[in-house]
Design a protein with these regions (language model features):
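Accessory terminal helices/loops
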Residues: 156-166, 175-253
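Core dinuclear metal-dependent hydrolase active-site scaffold
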Residues: 19, 98-124, 128-129, 160
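Active-site HxH/HxHxD metal-binding segment of metal-dependent hydrolases
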Residues: 28, 35-108, 193-197, 201
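Divalent metal-coordination and catalytic microenvironments
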Residues: 20, 32, 57, 69, ...
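Active-site metal-binding loops of divalent metal-dependent hydrolases
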Residues: 33-35, 58, 82-83, 114-115, ...
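Hydrophobic residues in well-ordered beta-strands that form the structural core
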Residues: 31, 77-79, 130-131, 169
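Active-site-adjacent loop/tail segments of enzyme domains
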Residues: 139-165
Length: 253
């Protein structure tokens, strides 16, 4: 199956939703629909219906429109089998499970940390990741339910994906993330270059998504907790402890 089209659209204040469909198709997949009207607009623009809905986690700003869309389009809802706080999935899925929608194969990656039941979806044949609130451009989600060891393990799973993986996350937080990253890694020239681009995108009211895993490994401090630089910076060689200190610093930045 050829590469699907991915349509990013804004929801609420700073959320992103995604509509995935194959070229010339009239149905596709919505990810984390929270703004019903915006979801209808993106579907209408593409003369399509939502055959499926994928849920990454149970926070209201990622699921608020799920039931209304399911009722309107008879959509198949897919979500983590262990998350009893999401709308009841028609297809419950688990870590490592692979399922197919419209010829595209999706792999489920369990990424606890932001919530205990958070999952990512990876389109295997095209190296496309929908990371929800686990990984952002130059940042990561707040640690509401997990612990540092758990969250670092989740990020390490993402780090093991192919370097050309395109990452589509749940929020436009990049500008604030960049400011924090520069405060602890000011001499990182890859980060400085990315910051220039992010500022330009912000000035032009353009999204900073998607990013790539290669770019994030160079620029995202939360993926670099196992680097020599942060070993020295935090005087530790334990990545999960470094992550804990870094996440706390970002929370208070």
């Amino acid at each position: 199956m050829g590469k699907p089209n991915i349509y990013l659209f804004p929801q609420l204040s700073d959320n992103y939703g995604y509509f995935i469909k194959n070229p010339h198709a009239t149905e596709g997949v919505l990810i984390d629909p929270s703004d019903y009207d915006m979801c209808l607009k993106i579907l209408e623009l593409n003369d399509s219906k939502a055959s499926h809905i994928l849920i990454t986690h149970h926070h209201e700003d990622h699921i608020a429109a799920v039931d209304k869309i399911r009722n309107k389009f008879n959509s198949t809802v897919i979500g983590y089998s262990q998350d009893d706080q999401i709308p009841k999935p028609d297809l419950p899925v688990d870590e490592g499970q692979i399922f197919e929608i419209h010829g595209q194969k999706y792999e489920v990656i369990h990424t606890p940390g932001h919530t205990l039941q958070h999952i990512n979806y990876f389109i295997k044949d095209h190296n496309i990741l929908f990371s929800g609130d686990t990984l952002f451009n130059t940042g990561c989600g707040r640690m509401f339910e997990g612990d540092p060891k758990m969250f670092w393990k989740s990020l390490s799973k993402i780090k093991s994906l192919p370097l050309d993986t395109k990452i589509y996350c749940g929020h436009e937080y990049t500008l604030s993330n960049i400011k924090f990253a520069l405060s602890i890694d000011p001499d990182n020239q890859d980060l400085v270059k990315l910051a220039d681009w992010v500022n330009q995108q912000e000035d032009e009211h353009r999204p900073t998504i998607p990013t790539t895993l290669k770019e994030q490994i160079h620029c995202n401090p939360f993926l670099r907790c196992d680097s020599e630089y942060f070993f020295r910076y935090y005087d530790s060689k334990e990545p999960d402890q470094i992550f804990a200190k870094m996440r706390s610093a970002k929370d208070n930045f």
